Amino acid sequence: MTFGVLFDLDQTLVDTSSLKTLRDRRMWRNVPHSLHLTRVCDGAQELIEALQTEGMPLGIVTSAPRMYAEQVIGYHGLNIEVLTAYHDTRAHKPAAAPVLHGMKALNASSGVYIGDAEIDRAAAIAAGLHFLGVPPISPEPLSQMITRIRLLAGEEKS
């Protein structure tokens, strides 16, 4: 049984709050000119590297269009191969469909979804996954999640 880890993108892996106006207005073509205003969230790169070292498959599930997500991921050099974006499913978060799509792409039968919003929590629960929240919905930062993820993965194997 393979345990997968899925992340939300905006405000979970990358602080894209500086792009909010562009995102709200769907000005996707202007995003590349503003990527320098974004930053990887504290602990994100370290968590990704630790999970990859342990052989856990990783993916991103976002409500953003693929073009936008790929630009953000590429700019910051996040080494995550699986991406489920807005147009990959007909239903969107808080529905289970995008999370299930990500799990299928990871070839994982169980896992955890990590996000910053209630729709992330709802999507994880609807998909039958564990959920770990980052601020603002939970005080736990990414840098402190490795132990909890290991415990969840261990529970699924036993």
Task: Please report, for each region that a protein language model flagged, where it lies by residue.
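Conserved phosphate-coupling serine/threonine residues in phosphotransfer and NTP-handling enzymes
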Residues: 62-64
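A generic structural signal for short coil/turn motifs at secondary-structure boundaries
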Residues: 59-60, 78
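Short, conserved structural micro-motifs that define repeat-unit consensus positions
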Residues: 57-58, 115
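Active-site neighborhood of HAD-like aspartate-dependent phosphohydrolases
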Residues: 1-42
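Catalytic-core regions built around general acid/base machinery
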Residues: 43-55
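Asp-based, Mg2+/Mn2+-dependent phosphohydrolase catalytic module
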Residues: 1-5, 37-39, 50-52, 66, ...
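Short amphipathic alpha-helical segments, especially helix-boundary/capping motifs
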Residues: 20-26, 43-46, 74-78, 97
